[in-house]
Amino acid sequence: MKVAVLGAAGGIGQALALLLKTQLPSGSELSLYDIAPVTPGVAVDLSHIPTAVKIKGFSGEDATPALEGADVVLISAGVARKPGMDRSDLFNVNAGIVKNLVQQVAKTCPKACIGIITNPVNTTVAIAAEVLKKAGVYDKNKLFGVTTLDIIRSNTFVAELKGKQPGEVEVPVIGGHSGVTILPLLSQVPGVSFTEQEVADLTKRIQNAGTEVVEAKAGGGSATLSMGQAAARFGLSLVRALQGEQGVVECAYVEGDGQYARFFSQPLLLGKNGVEERKSIGTLSAFEQSALEGMLDTLKKDIALGEEFVNK
């Protein structure tokens, strides 16, 4: 199983590469690519960690050597948020980066599963889909927007509030991956109940958690380490499913049946072909139903922005 990380010299990319080097199954290959000249050195640094994962680093304009034979491609390349910016401010720079890298994936490893981490995910996934479609290689079961950070944050905040072990809480999060489009389904967490105020406060905290980190880092970056952990969790789940493990479920932002929007984050059963089944979002509380209806315009606009970027 070969995993490629594009944007591997960045804050998320390095954290992700470290976690994959230590946690990928024995015999896996890990390929690191970034435009930054330091990237082969990051691979040498990680190669000294004693795990049976082969690692190589590539830099420069051409990602092809890193992508050859990849089964999973995780894309974290792009600029990070600074205080006062929201994820959509990143669009102008990151849209072009994602378009370019996905064009290279389409040429070199068109059958790979692709996880998009680069923000704004609501839009960059639509860009990736349109690029793959133009190249004639789009498979909607193999393109994912990685929203796992919203899930791990939800798990952490709920566990803190309710005095639970973080490992025993799993909150499904649906919708998109920014602001009001992030909708944690707190009504579906087994064995935990919340007051209306707690639901409102937690939902808001989960939606704004990225900004909390950006502000706390005071201009020094955005959420890189927790995002690295979230991306590793998703990537490792995908690898296990591709290798035939049954019953692997993760939430991610994918093209579905269009019931809510063309792309929508929901629980997915993963398997040898990527998405095996898009699971139902289940029964929502009145609060969740209203939040879902209220976000769809924003989500659809985000998606249209990405489609237009490729097709203009």
Swiss-Prot record:
Gene responsible for this protein: mdh
High-level lineage: Bacteria, Pseudomonadati, Pseudomonadota, Gammaproteobacteria, Enterobacterales
Reported function: Catalyzes the reversible oxidation of malate to oxaloacetate.
Residues reported to bind NAD(+): 7-13, 34, 94, 117-119, 227
This enzyme's EC code(s): 1.1.1.37
Pfam families, per database record: Ldh_1_C, Ldh_1_N
Subunit details: Homodimer.
Catalytic center residues: 177
UniProt-recorded name of the protein: Malate dehydrogenase
Similarity comment text for this entry: Belongs to the LDH/MDH superfamily. MDH type 1 family.
Keywords noted in UniProt: NAD, Oxidoreductase, Tricarboxylic acid cycle
Database matches in PANTHER family: MALATE AND LACTATE DEHYDROGENASE (PTHR11540), MALATE DEHYDROGENASE, MITOCHONDRIAL (PTHR11540:SF16)
Gene3D superfamilies: Lactate dehydrogenase/glycoside hydrolase, family 4, C-terminal, NAD(P)-binding Rossmann-like Domain
EC top class, as a word: oxidoreductase
Organism in which the protein naturally occurs: Escherichia coli (strain 55989 / EAEC)
